[in-house]
């Protein structure tokens, strides 16, 4: 089994529970306030590690108490932290609203995540042997995302981009990506196509492949996901669960996918891992606290 390297954000998540989302200009009363570790990078690293992958993290935390707390979370999950720098200033913070239906809205203040440089990424990758997969997202600077994909590809790794949030990714960057994994909203921003229907999402996936990506996977929430390569396409059904909080579902999906691929499974089986992990993450509150274990995933897949 090769190493999964996650290049991405580490955040403190401040989660507010609401009865309903406020309208613009409206004040509503929250029910709960909780603090959790998060950030798409950390979430995906933990998701993969809990499913049995060997994981190394590359990123940055602040010089505040939150930075030390986040580093402790990384190491407590068995994730290598040699590539996580401590920089002056605050750590990244996410403000998350979750209503009673489990739907969420998220605002991210990058903090230390904005100080991850391409040189940091390249140097950290050069120190890691036997890299199977390099996974990154849109919560670190674009130049660092590009370094992760280009250097990862040069080292013979499979490169995976979760373009969340959707930035102005250059075509040259996408050509260095083996698998791109947006949700339907991010896919619409990346392609300019209407992805609100199944047909639209399929068209967006084909468009991303035409730009040079080997495989495009578009997640569609409760409607599952679709995928396309140059040779074929298909759908990824959901596993039946009762959702409580959808905050880390996409990150769990990514973690399930890379854990399966790093273990040597084919794409079709990796899709099942991804769907199961994503579904299980919706059954618990919070980001990192909701990420499933290997035994939980295997139980759901065998059900």
What are these regions (language model features)?
Residues 1-60, 65-76, 242-244:
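Glycine-rich phosphate/adenosyl-contacting loop at the front of the ribokinase-like
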Residues 73-88:
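A glycine-rich helix N-cap at a beta->alpha junction
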Residues 1, 167-173, 198-303:
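Conserved phosphate-binding/catalytic region of the ribokinase-like
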Residues 60, 86, 96-133, 138:
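Conserved phosphate-binding/catalytic loop of the ribokinase/pfkB sugar-kinase fold
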Residues 121, 131-203, 222-225:
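Conserved beta-alpha-beta core of the PfkB/ribokinase-like small-molecule kinase fold
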Residues 78, 114-119, 159-166, 237:
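Short gly/ser/thr-rich secondary-structure transition/capping motifs
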């Amino acid at each position: 089994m090769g190493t999964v390297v996650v290049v991405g954000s580490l955040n403190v998540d401040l989660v507010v529970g609401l009865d309903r989302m406020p309208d613009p200009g409206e004040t509503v009363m929250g029910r709960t306030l909780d603090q959790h570790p998060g950030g798409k990078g950390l979430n995906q690293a933990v998701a993969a590690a809990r499913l049995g992958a060997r994981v190394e993290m590359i990123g940055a935390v602040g010089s505040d108490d939150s930075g030390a707390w986040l580093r402790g979370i990384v190491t407590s999950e068995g994730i290598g932290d040699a590539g996580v720098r401590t920089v002056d200033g605050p750590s990244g913070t996410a403000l998350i609203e979750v209503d009673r239906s489990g739907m969420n809205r998220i605002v991210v203040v990058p903090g230390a995540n904005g100080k991850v440089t391409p040189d940091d990424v390249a140097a950290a990758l050069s120190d890691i042997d036997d890299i199977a997969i390099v996974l990154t997202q849109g919560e670190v600077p674009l130049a660092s995302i590009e370094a992760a994909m280009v250097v990862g590809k040069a080292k013979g790794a499979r490169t995976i981009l979760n373009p969340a949030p959707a930035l102005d990714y250059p075509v040259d960057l996408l050509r260095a990506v083996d698998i791109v994994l947006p949700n339907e909203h991010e896919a619409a921003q990346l392609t300019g196509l209407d992805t609100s229907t199944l047909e639209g999402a399929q068209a967006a996936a084909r468009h991303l492949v035409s730009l040079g990506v080997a495989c495009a996977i578009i997640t569609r929430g409760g409607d599952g996901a679709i995928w396309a390569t140059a040779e074929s396409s298909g759908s990824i059904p959901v596993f039946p669960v009762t959702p409580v909080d959808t905050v880390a579902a996409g990150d769990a999906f990514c973690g399930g996918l890379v854990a399966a691929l790093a273990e040597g499974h084919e794409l079709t089986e990796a899709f099942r891992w991804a769907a199961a992990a994503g579904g299980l993450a919706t059954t618990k509150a919070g980001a990192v606290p909701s990420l499933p274990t290997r035994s939980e995933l295997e139980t759901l897949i065998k059900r």
